[in-house]
Amino acid sequence: MGSRIIIASKNPIKINATKLGFQKVYSNIDFECEGVSVPSDVSDQPMTNQETLQGAINRATHAKNGFPNAAFWVGIEGGIEKVGEEMMAFAWIVIVSTEATGKARTGTFFLPPKVVELINQGKELGEADDIVFGHSNSKQKNGAVGILTGNLIDRTQFYVEAMVLALIPFLNKEIY
């Protein structure tokens, strides 16, 4: 198995979460992780579960097509979805290799009404968080999950668990 992973993002949180997730599963391999910019082909703020999953699939696919010299390509897409008057936040992780594809979703949490109001006005989640909580560039840091949990769950941890779950087909090739 090769050791190069292309992450379809230059966000340091997503790159680090990918490295940590792969290290948990493949502790005997030293992975080289490289973040690249590729389009998601979905809206800047995906507003449904399906759109968010599609964004992660598209990112992984574009990474593979644009940077074919790797063992794995990873797409991570954060999204939100309305549930009645409330709004939940989550992310999808898609891992592609030449042999298999793995997909998993992070845990889900509900956003506070002030953040929801700004999203309904057209702001992205990260921008809404910055306004409501007085932060700057929170989406490159611990994001909404870190802010709302007081960093009990930081954004890296939030992604790592789903990264491991997305690797299930690679760990169980004989049944996937």
State what each model feature region is.
Residues 2-69:
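N-terminal polybasic phosphate/anion-binding patch
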Residues 44-176:
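Anionic-ligand binding patches
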